[in-house]
From Swiss-Prot:
This is Tubulin alpha chain. Signal peptide: none annotated. It is an enzyme of class 3 (hydrolase). It catalyses: GTP + H2O = GDP + phosphate + H(+). It comes from Zymoseptoria tritici. GO terms for molecular function: GTP binding; hydrolase activity; metal ion binding; structural constituent of cytoskeleton.
Length: 450
């Protein structure tokens, strides 16, 4: 069996996880107490979800997931919430004091006390797996726990499970909805630390998701639950191929193989369609062609950037629901004729396709309409570098005045780590520029490479 362990770090990680497990349970017919629903028991046997759930002796299903936060409030809500009997109580680990939006506290002082306890539980869950495939790590860039403790966890996982692949789902700080002023510092420090430890990072930008909720779903003032439920749909689409049998299965390593041309360039842009509210759903056809096209629209993307300014290196289209390969091939053929989708010239215009026949589920009374097919697009495009440059600019404004730096140094960090992280990010931006620059220009004298 190819199991996957989810690790949820900090407030953002834990709250996104709540929405994800709520959705997984609906998709697999598991009740909030961990037992299968009657309809599910009657249905034919499908053990695909044992990648995400382990079964106990008395037929209860327990998520293979660990909650870790340096302060107890968010995890306490899970401990007392609807799904309190679903999760294993020992796999919810909380500290006493939070990281107070400070990367250094999450990574050095406060995080250091909790990390061994978390890794001990990871080992415990991993020992229950017959063939552990890898880890999904959910965290934010802006918070102290998400950035600092998240980075520390990634480092330690590399040491303990070097060969296993690690995918991140990270919440990118949104310009409009910042919760703390030092988000640019935390983001750049955590990106620098995790760059070599993560195999593939799916970034989610809060602002982009706010806009989707406002524009496509008509929610005037979206709250975190609205955002997280949308994120959960995306995560569910990405992991559907691991949990259900489809005609074209994708496992964790395949994401990497298909999306990451160079180890550092591992930040695919995620888009999802159709995102329609229940009120409008009846008037939309949502053909395979339509939803495939709308994935390339900027307003279905999870990060604010304009892919028309960049070039694509690789694209995965993950369909689910009522989709037949013939329609997909037609849709892809049409996409290839569109000149707006520009690939780098050293890469064939290949689209990796995955199809999972399980239709997308939706949360009762949720914002999203019930649809019979959906698609999630993961594309590695050079346009995502825009997100980095926006962040670097804010970092520079503050760091030029050394604003707030003393809080980090006071927690045992060296000031040199700031400039080191900033240089690493500048190098990352340059990597993206080089990839986008036409490779044909530099190759006149380079025949020897082939």
């Amino acid at each position: 069996m190819r199991e996957v362990i989810s690790l949820n770090v900090g407030q953002a990680g834990c709250q996104i996880a709540n929405s994800c497990w709520e959705l997984y349970c609906l998709e697999h017919g598991i009740q909030p107490d961990g037992y299968l629903t009657e309809e599910r028991k009657a249905a034919e046997d499908d053990d695909g979800f044992s990648t995400f759930f382990s079964e106990t002796g008395n037929g209860k299903y327990v998520p293979r997931t660990i909650y870790a936060d340096l302060e107890p409030n968010v995890v306490d809500e899970v401990r007392t919430g609807t799904y309190r009997s679903l999760f294993h109580p020992e796999l919810m680990i909380t500290g006493k004091e939070d990281a107070s939006n400070n990367y250094a506290r999450g990574h050095y002082t406060v995080g250091k006390e909790l990390i061994d306890q978390v890794l001990d539980k990871v080992r415990h869950v991993a020992d229950n797996c017959s063939g552990l495939q890898g880890f999904l790590v959910f965290h934010s860039f802006g918070g102290g726990t998400g950035s600092g403790f998240g980075a520390l966890l990634m480092e330690r996982l590399s040491v303990d499970y070097g060969k296993k692949c690690k995918l991140e789902f990270c919440v990118y700080p949104a310009p409009q909805v910042a919760t703390s002023v030092v988000e640019p510092y935390n983001s750049i420090l955590t990106t620098h630390t995790t760059l070599e430890h993560s195999d593939c990072s799916f970034m989610v930008d809060n602002e982009a998701i706010y806009d989707i909720c406002r524009r496509n779903l008509g929610i005037e003032r979206p709250n975190y639950e609205n955002l997280n439920r949308l994120i959960a749909q995306v995560v569910s689409s990405i992991t559907a191929s691991l949990r259900f049998d489809g005609s074209l299965n994708v496992d964790l390593n395949e994401f990497q193989t298909n999306l990451v041309p160079y180890p550092r360039i591992h930040f695919p842009l995620v888009a999802y369609a159709p995102i329609v509210s229940a009120a409008k759903a009846a008037h939309e056809a949502n053909s395979v062609q339509e939803i495939s096209m709308s994935c390339f629209e900027p307003n279905s993307q999870m990060v604010k950037c304009d892919p028309r300014n960049g070039k694509y290196m690789a694209t995965c289209l993950l369909y689910r629901g009522d989709v037949v390969p013939k329609d997909v091939h037609q849709a892809v053929a049409t996409l290839k004729t569109k000149r707006t989708i520009q690939f780098v010239d050293w890469c064939p215009t290949g689209f990796k396709i995955g199809i999972c026949y399980q239709p997308p589920q939706n949360v009762p009374n949720g914002d999203l309409a019930k649809v019979n097919r959906a698609v999630c697009m993961l594309s590695n495009t050079t346009a995502i570098a825009e997100a980095w440059s926006a962040l670097s600019h804010k970092f520079d404004l503050m760091y030029s005045k050394r604003a707030f730096v003393h809080w980090y140094v006071g927690e045992g960090m060296e000031e040199g780590e700031f400039s080191e992280a900033r240089e690493d990010l500048a190098a990352l931006e340059r990597d993206y520029e080089e990839v986008a620059a036409d490779s044909a220009e530099g190759d006149e004298g380079g025949e020897a490479e082939y």
